[in-house]
Amino acid sequence: MDLGDLNKVWEIKALKKKPASDEAQKTLEKIAKQVQPIMKKHRWRVKVLSEFCPNNPALLGLNVGGGVNVKLRLRKANRDQDFIPYNQVLDTMLHELCHNAHGPHNASFYKLWDDIRKVYI
């Protein structure tokens, strides 16, 4: 077995009770596919990539357990029909993936995020 195949998103879950859940699912799938080369290079894994709509409108993403669950906001706060632009969600995903290597927002974290953004955004 090629161990590189393990470094990916394993499961994707959009919020089914929200409007346009099929569009949300496709967005998450596209993001997972786009970041797979990064994940393979850095040996990062995400068990579940899911959509969330937190009460805090400034919260765009969350990485729980070093990649056990990465949650992304796909919709604008209190506007379920309005999706956040794809590149912004992709940037949030890159940010959350960097937490697989560095928990806190320190200089090492921001350097890694900046380096990845230069290549993939």
Describe the predicted segments one by one.
Residues M1-L90, N100-I121:
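Active-site-proximal or metal-binding-adjacent scaffold patches in catalytic folds
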Residues E96:
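Walker B catalytic acidic pair
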